[in-house]
Amino acid sequence: MNIGVAILTHSVVMLSEALQGFADLLTSGFLLIGYSRSKKRADGEFQFGYGKEIYFWTLLSVLAMFFVTATLSIVFGYNRIIKPEPIINTPFMFAGLAVAFATNSYACLLSIKRLCKNMNSKNIWQSFMRSALIEVKTASVLDLMGTLSAFFGIIAFIIFMLTGDYRYDGYGALIIGINIACMSVVLMIELRSFIAGKSVSSQTIKTIKQVALATRGVRGVSDIRTMYQGSEKFMLNIDITVNDSLTAHEIGVIIDTLKVNLMSAIKNIRYIQVELDN
C-alpha cells in the first residue's frame, strides 16, 4: 500500500515507509528460512545440529536492512532536502501514515507481550535482554522500528502542513532512515553475542546447579559452562565431584540420572556433557 501512496503523493516519507515495509517482509522471509533450517537433524558434518542457522539468516536480513533500506531512505531524504518537490494528494499520505502507525503499534504491543510472557517478567527491557528467542526479539525490534518510522513520518507531515515547506518531507525520510539504521545496529549487537557463544542467564545457571546438587551421589559442582545453539536451545558442560570410593558402574548411573534430571527440569537443553572433577 505504501508504495502506491508514495506514487500518488510524490512523498519520500511514504517511499521510506514502503522500503521499511519491504525490509519487514524480507526479514520475515529470512527468519522463516533460518527457523526451518535450524530444525534439521544433526548429521556427520554438523554433529551439534543446525541450530545456529537462524543467526546467519537473521544477520543477512539485518545487513540488507542497514545497507539497503536505511541507506536509500537517507539518500532520498537528503536529496529532497536539497531539491524540494511538491507533495500532492496529502490526504492519502496522512491516511497511509495513520494506518502504518496503527498496525505497527498493535504488532509491537503483541510482540512485547509475547516476549514478556516467554520470560515470565513484566519488565520489557529485562525480558528483551534475557530472551534467547532471536526471532521474537527481531520481530519486536522490527515492529518498534515500524511504529517509530510512522510516528516520525506523521510529525514531518504535520510540520509540512503547518509551514508549507516541502523540505520537511525530506527531513522525515532522513530521520526514518536513521531510525532503521539504529534498529539494525541493535539487532547486530544482539546477534553478535549469540554468534560468539552467549551463555544462559545466571538464573538458569543457578537452577542447573540446584538440580545437580539435588541428584543423589553428586557431592559438588565445580564448573558449569553453557552456550546457545539456536533459538532457546543450549548445550551444557558440567563438572561434578562424586565419592572416590564409587565404582565405574555407580558413577555411570549417577551421570545418567543427572542428565535425566536436568533434561526434565530445563526443557531447553539440547546436549549435556558431564565430566568428573576429583
Label every PLM stretch briefly.
Residues 3, 9, 21-32, 99-112:
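Hydrophobic alpha-helical membrane-embedded segments
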Residues 52-278:
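Alpha-helical transmembrane segments and adjacent TM-loop junctions that form the membrane-embedded core
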Residues 35-53:
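Aspartate-rich (DDxxD/NDxxD/DxxxD) Mg2+/diphosphate-binding motifs
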